[in-house]
Structures are given as structure tokens and as C-alpha cells.
Amino acid sequence: MAAALLLVACARPYVSPLAPPPHRDEITAGYDAAWAAIVRALAKENVALRAIARDSGVIASDDFVAPIGVYADCGRIGDDLLEGEALVSFTLFVEPNGTHTNVQINSRMRTHMYRRGGSGKFRPTPVFQCASTGRFEANLLDTVRELVRH
């Protein structure tokens, strides 16, 4: 019993990252051109789609694996950042706004295989929630803007 209490007392707390709000942006193109560019940009990134509904403006990706730190911030345990892989998915909401198109990107992320810091064995559990770094969203919308220009 004393050993268990000592182990718990020495355990470092998990510090989760602050979740950012959904990424919102405006594309300076009509809905049809923006929609086509978004679909092409997702295909260029090789993102598998679970659902795509042009009439309602919703695109949902399947979960895909990404290195922690690229698209996902998974926090830390004590002073050690979590490293490894995260499962990430995105849902895009696209709606016309006159001659422009509004896009909102929601993200969902969790650890897949991780370790504390740069050493140790990778493990799948416990699963920790992660927050978006904003990199996927920014890169995707940059690609969309480039595609609507051409």
C-alpha cells in the first residue's frame, strides 16, 4: 500500500494543450469554384474522406495518422512533451457568402502511439486528447487559394 501511494505521489500530471476555436476563413471565390478547389486540395494531401455532401457544404475526413507536433499538440506529462503519432480528423463546413465562400474547419485529435519525451517505449494507452496546431488548416486553405487563382 505504501509503495502504491509513493508511486502516485511521484507521478507527474498530464497537462493538456488548450484547444483553439474552429478555424474560420473566407475564400475569395464563388461556392462552386471554392468547393472544387477544397476537394482537389484534400485529394492532393491524400486525405481519405468519410463523407462529402456538396448540397449541405459538409466534408468529413476519416481518421488519419500524423506525427505529434505537426498537426496535433498532445500536451505533456510533467516537463516532457508527448511524442509519436496522433489520430486526426477534420470536418469542413463550406457556405456561400455572396461572391465569396466561408469555410470553417473543426478538428478532432487524440494520441495513437506515443511516449514521454525523446525516449521510452511507444504505447497506445492511455489515450490523451490533442489540440490542432493550425498547420493543416492553414496549409489546406493556402492550397485552396492557389487553386482558385488558376
Spans of features found by a protein language model:
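Sec-dependent signal peptide recognition
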Residues: 1-3
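C-terminal motif of bacterial Sec signal peptides marking the signal peptidase cleavage site
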Residues: 6-9
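Ser/Thr-rich, low-complexity intrinsically disordered terminal regions
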Residues: 11-150
